[in-house]
Amino acid sequence: MTLADLRTQADELDRNDSLAHLRDRFCIPRHTDGADVAYLCGNSLGLAPTAARECVEQELVAWEQLGVEGHFKHERPWVSFHELFAKHLAEIVGAKPYEVVAMNTLTVNLHLMLTSFYRPTHERFKVLVGHAAFPSDRYALASQIELRGHNPEEAILTAKPLAASRVLRTEDVVALIEQHASELALVLMDGVNYYTGERIDIAAITEAAHRHGIVAGFDLAHAAGNVPLALHDWNADFAVWCHYKYLNGGPGCVAGCFVHERHGFAREPRARMAGWWGHDKHSRFKMGPDFEPIPGAEGWQLSNPPLFSLAALLPSLELFAEAGMDRLRAKSEALTGFLELAIRGLFPEWGEVITPAEPARRGCQLSIRVTRDAKRAFVALVANGVICDWREPDVIRLAPVPLYNRFADIVRCVEVLSCAK
Ligand SMILES: Cc1ncc(COP(=O)(O)O)c(C=O)c1O
C-alpha cells in the first residue's frame, strides 16, 4: 500500500459517505495554515455543534427577559428542562426514558451510585475493577470503601490481562467473578477503556455478576455515543458517563446516569444521598421535611440542573437522533478500520496497536504503543494540525468519530507520520 492508494480510497469513501453532511454542523478548529485540523480527539473533548451557541443564547435571553419566571413561563420551562434529555439519552444508552437522567458530573454520579449500590457486608465487601480503570474511579471507589470501614487495598480486586495479551478478555473477567463470587459486593467496569480502547461485554459480565447476587455497574465515559448500548436489556444495575467526549456537550458538561427500573421503581426505595430535585415533582414546592424520591433515575437528582450546560448539550443529542446509532456505528467501524489499515500497512514497525483488532471489541479509538521516537511523533502530529492525545509512557490515542471526521483526516494523520519518521 502507498500513500497515493490511501488518498484515492479516502476520496472515494468520503464521496460515498451518507453522513458526510453532518460535519458542517460542527465547528472544526483551524490549524495555523488556515485548513481544518484533523481532529482525532473526540474521545477526550468532542467538538462544538454549530447550533450550541444559539441554544445557549436562547436561555441567556430568557434569563435576561424573564428572570425567575423562566422556571415556569419560558417556552421550554427550566423546571422541566432536563426532561427534554431523557428520550435522547435513553436511545443512546439503550434504556427506558425513566431509567436515565442528566445531572451533576461523572465522578459525582459515581459517588451517588456507589452510595446506593455498594452495600458491603462482613463477608462480601470486595469490588472487581478493570486493570486500567480511570484514576478518578479508583479514588472514588477507595474513598467509598474507606467510608464503610474497609481497607481499599484489601477490597479492590483488579482484573488484569493475561500475560500474553494487553487487553482484558470478557471471559477472564467472568472467570474472576466466579473465583471470587463469595467475597464480591460489586463489579465496576468501563464499557470502553480509556487507555486501551478495548470494549467489554456488559451483558456477559452483568449476567455472571447477577448469577452470584453481585451488583454490576459501569463507567461509560468512553462508550456512550461511541458504541451501541442496551443497558436495560443487558440488565446493568447502574451506569454513569460524561457528555463532553463523544456526546459533544462542551467542557465540564453535565453528566449522565442510568439506574435500572428494578431499582428505580422498587417498592422499597434504595438508600441514597438525597436532594430536593430528586423529590416527588408534585410536592417538591410544598417544601415538606420528608424526602419522597421520584421513581426512576430522576429520584437520584440532588440540585436543580445547570441550564446553560444542558442547553449546550441538546444540539448534539438531536444530531445523534437524526443520524441514528446504527449508521454512526457503521461509519465508525469503517473509519477505525481504515485508520488501522493505514497504520499497519504503512508503518508496521512504528508501534503496536494495543486496541483489539475485532471491531466488536472496540469503539472508534485506536491506542498505539509507539516503540520508536514516540514523543517526537506526537509533537509532529499536533504541530501539523493532527489533534490527538498522549498517554504516559508511550501511547498515542487516535479517535476518528463518525459525526464529523472524514477519511481524509486519517490520510492527513498518516502523511504527517510519514514525514516525521
Ligand atoms: C473513563 C473516565 N472515567 C471518569 C472520568 C472523570 O470524569 P469527570 O472529571 O467528568 O468526573 C473520565 C474523564 O475523562 C474518564 O475518561
Regions found by a protein language model. Name each.
Residues 1-421:
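Pyridoxal 5′-phosphate
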